[in-house]
Amino acid sequence: MAQQTFTGRKRVRKFFGHIREVAEMPNLIEVQKASYDQFLMVEEPVGGRLDEGLQAVFRSVFPISDFSNTSMLEFVRYEFEPPKYDVDECRQRGMTYAAPLKVTLRLIVFDIDEETGARSVKDIKEQDVYMGDIPLMTMNGTFVVNGTERVIVSQMHRSPGVFFDHDKGKTHSSGKLLFAARVIPYRGSWLDIEFDAKDIVFARIDRRRKLPVTSLMFALGLDGEEILSTFYKKIIYKRTKEGWRVPFDANRFRGYTTTNDVIDADTGKVVLEAGKKLTVRAARQLQEKGLKALRMTDEDIVGNYLAEDLVNPKTGEIYAEAGEEITEKSLKALNEQGYKDLTLLDIDHVNIGPYIRNTLAADKNMTREDALFDIYRVMRPGEPPTLDSAQNMFQSLFFDSERYDLSAVGRVKMNMRLELDAPDTHRTLRKEDILAVIKTLVGLRDGRGEIDDIDHLGNRRVRSVGELMENQYRIGLLRMERAIKERMSSVDIDTVMPQDLINAKPAAAAVREFFGSSQLSQFMDQTNPLSEITHKRRLSALGPGGLTRERAGFEVRDVHPTHYGRICPIETPEGPNIGLINSLATFARVNKYGFVETPYRRVKDGRVTDEVVYLSAMEEGRYAVAQANVQLDPKGRFVEDLIVCRDGGTRDVVLIPADKVDFMDVSPKQLVSVAAALIPFLENDDANRALMGSNMQRQAVPLVRAEAPFVGTGMEGVVARDSGAAIAARRTGVVDQIDATRIVIRATEDLDPTKSGVDIYRLMKFQRSNQSTCINQRPLVKVGDQVAKGDIIADGPSTDLGELALGRNVLVAFMPWNGYNFEDSILLSERIVKDDVFTSIHIEEFEVMARDTKLGPEEITRDIPNVSEEALKNLDEAGIVYIGAEVRAGDILVGKITPKGESPMTPEEKLLRAIFGEKASDVRDTSLRVPPGVQGTIVEVRVFNRHGVDKDERALAIEREEIERLAKDRDDEQAILDRNVYGRLADLLDNRQGIAGPKGFKKDTKITRAVLEEYPKSQWWMFASPNDKLMAEIEAMRKQYDESKKGLEQRFLDKVEKLQRGDELPPGVMKMVKVFVAVKRKIQPGDKMAGRHGNKGVVSKIVPIEDMPFLEDGTHADIVLNPLGVPSRMNVGQILETHLGWACAGLGKRIGQTIDAYYQKQDLKPMRETLKKIYGDDETIKSLNDAELIELARNLKPGVPIATPVFDGAKEADIEEMLHLAGLDASGQSTVYDGRTGDSFDRKVTVGYIYMLKLHHLVDDKIHARSIGPYSLVTQQPLGGKAQFGGQRFGEMEVWALEAYGAAYTLQEMLTVKSDDVAGRTKVYEAIVRGDDTFEAGIPESFNVLVKEMRSLGLNVDLHNSKLAGTPSEAAE
C-alpha cells in the first residue's frame, strides 16, 4: 500500500494484507461531531433550518400563549454569537467553552371581541433575547467544561416502537407462555397489552393496575359488536329440513377432528367418517372435488358464539346479545322463535381462539363512559371523575402531541412491525395502531408470527450528544414555559417586551446540569490518543433512561449476531459493566434514525462491485452477506460455486450458490473496534485475552521517546490523525518558519482572498492531560519543506512520524530466569532504565487560593512566620516558586499566610504584651507544599487575579511574556502577508507603462523591478498604469490587504485586552496560583507492563545488563518473559509477533550494512536492491530521490516496520520468508547464553522483538506510608486511603490471626493506642520521648460511640469503674 505522504516517505511500512480496501474508513470521531453539528446547525442559513435539533426544540415549546389567550409569544429564529474565549483560554482559565445563544422572539397581543369572541391582532413586538450559553464542541469532539475536557458518551437504548414478547413460561406454574405487547414511545406513557393465565387479554398504562383490553377499545369509541367484527370473521348457518347448512372452507377446517360423520349438504353423502382428523391435504382435496357446504346438526352448533344481537323484528326485544355462547337451552328457544339463519363467530379453538370474546364477556364495563371512568380511576386514584376530565385525560395519554411522541423512529418501527403505512410525521398513536397491536398479539397466541428479539440491533438505537442535549434543553425550556405563562398573565401585556417575560436561568441551568453531572457526561480518558478516540466512540447501555448494572441480565450483555460490523464483540470492560459498555466497530456509523449501520459491497449476478452500501441491522435481515476473505478472480467473480454466507433471516452461517449472494463485507477489520484492530495477529489470540489487550492499550502511558511498533496493523496512522494528537496540514504549502512551539506554513493552494495566506500551528508543550500524563508536540518538518494538505507536520504524545506509538520494541527472550518471572512477573534489563526506554513524564497540578476571610484577607507572600530562609530558596519576591526549580515532598510552592483569630488572653499574657509590645504575628502559615511522594521540576506557573486587585510582579512578568508571544505571531503573519502581497504587486506592475507614481517618478516611463526597489514598499500603491483592468485588480488587492492588516491588529488587541482584564474567580477568592510540576518516572519494580495480546505482568526485578541472557553476537535481552504464560492463555499472537519482530530487526541490520557500504563506496545500488527485495514493487520507494532514500534507510535501520492487518495478516509462510530474507533461522529460535556464567542454555530459546507498553498503574502512585495523620472525627480512628493520608486497616480477619497466635499485647496495642484510644496515644508519645517503653491501654473511643448508640436506642448503659480482673480501667465519661 503506497503512502505518498510527507511522513509516509520517511518510513514505509511493508503491507501484508491481501484484501483490497474498497470503502474509506469514516473519520473515527464522526459520531460525536456529526451529531452535535446536527443539533446546533450553526452553518445552516438562519431561515432555511430543518425542523430538527435546537430548531425543533424551540418549535415544540413555542408559541406560548397566556391563560386567557390574549397574547402569544412566538419563536422566530436563533443564532450564536462568537464565544468569549477560545478553547485554550478556557482550558487555562477554568471556563466553559460556550457560545451565547441569541433568540429572536415575537410577542403578539390580541384584541378579543366580547360578543363574538373573535381575536384580532392589536400589537406585534419583536426582540432578540439572550438565552444562556450553549457549550461548543472542540475540533476533537470534546467539550471544555470548567476548564476540563469532557466527553458525552452515546447511549444505547430500546428503540421506540412496539415489541412483542412472552414470559418464557416463568409466570405460571404450568409453564404456559403468556404473550405481551408493549408500545414504547420516545416520551409519554407506555402501553402494555398482555394475556393472563386464563387467556383473558388485559391492558396496562404506565405499569399501573390492569384493565380488560376491551375497556380500552370501548374508550376508543368501539361497541361490543364492532369489537367482535374487528377480530373475528362471521359464518352464516342456514336452516334446512335436514339440519344446518354451513359453507365449506378448506383453510378453516384443516386440523379439525370430527365427532360425527361429515356429510355433504348438497348430495347427502358421507365425506369423512367420525373420529378422523382432517389434514391440510385432505381438506384441499375435498375442496377440489367440489365440496361446497356441509350439513351440521344442532349439537354441532352448541358451544359456538353469536356474532350479532338477535332481535325480535316485531317487538324489538333482544333475545341474545352478540358474543353470547349458544347452549342447548338457548338453541331450543331460538328454534321455537323460528330463526332461519344464524350469524356465528368463526372460532374453532384450533386456529382461532375466543380470547377477545372471553375478555368482552368478562369486562364489566359496557359503555364508553364506564370505560373512560375506569381508566381515569386507574391513572388518578382518589380523584372523582367527570366525563369531561376523563375524556381529556384519555385524549392526552396517547393522542396529544405535547404529551406523547413516538418520534420518527418509533413510527417507522411501528409501520414495519404492524405492516401499516402512516407517514413518519404522525407521531402520536391512532386507533388503528392500537387495534393492530392487539390483533398481532392475538395472532401470536394463535401461533402465527414470531416474538421480537429485544437485543437485536434493529430494536436498539443510539442516542448521541446532539439528541441527549436536545432532550435536556427541552426540559429547560418547559420549566421556563411555566414561568413565562404566569408572567404573561400577571403583567400589563401592552407595555412589556419579550425580554421582560423571559428568564433564561432554567434553560441555562438544565444545560449546565447535563454537562456537569449527567452520567453520560464523563471526564475524558486522556491517557493517550487511543484512549481519547475510544472514549468518544463508546456506546453505553447505562445512564438516564437506560439499564442499571444490577438489573441487566446475561442476554443484554451478550454478543448478538447483529453486532457484526456494528459493535465490537471484543472491546468491553471486565467486571460489572461487561457487555453494557461497548465500542463502535471501525467502519460503523450511526444513521439519522440512530441505528448503527455497517458498509457492504454490492454483489450483482455473482460479481462483486465496488459500490458500497450502508445497511442497518433491520435491512441486513433480508440479505445474504459473504465474508471479506472470499476468493475472487481478477474480474471480481467468486472462484467457488458455493459461498459461505451469513443469512440475515435465519442469522446462521450457510452455504449459498454464488449467484444468490447479495452483499460482501468491505474489510476483514470491519467487525472489530479501533483498539482491537491495533492488535496484530488478533486472529491467533483467545477472545478473553484480546479483550484485555484492547483495554490495556488504552492505559499505556506516553513515553519520553515514542517508537512505532515494528509489527503494526496499518491502523496506527489513522488513529494518530483522527485523534488530533498528531497535527495535519490544513492546506498545501511551504514551511516558512519553525521552532519548538509553532509551525508557520505559507499556503500555495486553496488561497482565499478573504482569508490569510498563512497557517500558524501552535504546538502544545508539556501540557497536563486529564490523567496527568504529558502532552507534548514536536515538529517533523524543516523550513522550505513542501507539505500537502493532510500531511502530518508534528508528532504528539504517543505518536512517531504520524503513527500511533504506545510503547517500545524490546528484545524479548521467552525463558524462566531464577523464578523472577514466576506468575507473569517480568524481568527487565538495566539498559531499559539507563537508556530511558520506558521513562515517562507526568505533570501534577497544584493550586492555592487566597480568599477574603472574616478575619481579613489571606496573602500570598514570601514573608512566612517560623520558616527558615533555606525553605524559601525556590520562591521569588512574590512568594511563588520559580520555573525550573527542583522540588521534593514538603517543599513550599507558594507561600501563603492566613489571619488567625484573636484568642482570649490571660492576665499574665496581657502583662507581657504591655511590657514587650506587639505579639510576633497573628497569622498562620497555610502555604502550598509539595505532597508526599512527589518530586520533580516546576514547568509552569499561572497566576490569576480578581478584577480590580493589583497584580504582583510575577503576574505582570507572565503577562508580558504572553503579550510578546502574541506580538511575534502577529508580526510573522504580517511579514508573510507583506511578502505575498508586495510580491504579487511587483509581478503586476513589472514592465508596465507608468502614468503616475510616488514623488520623483518620471511620468510615462516603464516601471521595472529596479525602479520599484528605489521606493519603500508602502509607496508602491501610488504607481498607476493606463490599463484600467490592472488598476481595478490592484485596487481590490489593496483593499483586501488593508482589511487583513486591520483584522490582524484587531485580533492582537482583543487577545491583549483579555490578558490584561482581571480573571473571573469563584466568589470570595482574591487570587489563585496554579503550579505545574513535571515528574520523571523511570520504570521500576512494581510497575505494570503489558503487550498488546493481554499478556500483562508486574516488573519483579531489574537485572544488571551483564547478567541478562545474551545471544551469540553478544546482544543482551532487554526483557525475559515466562513461556508458561502462553499455552494456558492461548494468546499465541505474541509469539508470532516476536518472530516477525525478530525478522524486522534483522532486515533493519541488513539495511544498516548497505548504509555503511554507501559511505565507503558512494554507491546506492546495493541499498536500492535490498529495499526492492524487502518491499517488492512498491511505488513509494521507486519514486524516492537519493537524499530521500538515504533518510528512509536511516529510519529503517532499527527495524523494518510492517503492517499485518487483523484477519488478513502475515501467514506462517510469510514469517518464514521474512526470517529467511533477514538471514535468520526459520524456527525463530536462537542459542542463548547465561549472562552470569557465560554457558549456553541446553535448549534453543525463542528470541525476538515484542512491543511492550508501560501501563498507567505505577507503583509510585500506589505506594504510601503514614506515621501520624488525620483521624476520623466520630470514631477517632485513622482515615483510610492514600488520598486522605490514611493508615492501614486492621480488619476482623487480621484480629483473628493475632488471636490465633495468642499475641495478646500486640493485639491490644493495635486496637487501642495505635488506633482510637485518644488519651493512650498521647501517653505513648510522651513515654517514647522520655525513653520509657511501657504504656497502658485505655478505653477505645469507638467503645464510647457504641455506648452512645445504645443510649440512643433507649438502653441506659453505664461503665462502672471497678477493678476488673486486676486491671485498672478508666471511666467512660
Swiss-Prot record:
GO CC terms of this entry: DNA-directed RNA polymerase complex
Keywords from the named record: DNA-directed RNA polymerase, Nucleotidyltransferase, Transcription, Transferase
Signal peptide limits: none
Name of the featured protein: DNA-directed RNA polymerase subunit beta
Function description: DNA-dependent RNA polymerase catalyzes the transcription of DNA into RNA using the four ribonucleoside triphosphates as substrates.
Disulfide bonds, paired cysteine numbers: none
GO biological process: DNA-templated transcription
Enzyme Commission no: 2.7.7.6
Family: Belongs to the RNA polymerase beta chain family.
NCBIfam families to which the protein is assigned, alphabetical: PRK00405.1, rpoB
Phosphoprotein as UniProt keyword: no
One Pfam match: RNA_pol_Rpb2_1
Subunit field text: The RNAP catalytic core consists of 2 alpha, 1 beta, 1 beta' and 1 omega subunit. When a sigma factor is associated with the core the holoenzyme is formed, which can initiate transcription.
One GO MF term: DNA binding
InterPro entries (alphabetical): DNA-dir_RNA_pol_bsu_ext_1_sf (IPR042107), DNA-dir_RNA_pol_bsu_external_1 (IPR019462), DNA-dir_RNA_pol_su2 (IPR015712), DNA-dir_RNAP_su2_dom (IPR007120), DNA-dir_RNAP_su2_hyb_sf (IPR037033), RNA_pol_bsu_bac (IPR010243), RNA_pol_bsu_CS (IPR007121), RNA_pol_bsu_protrusion (IPR007644)
HAMAP family: RNApol_bact_RpoB
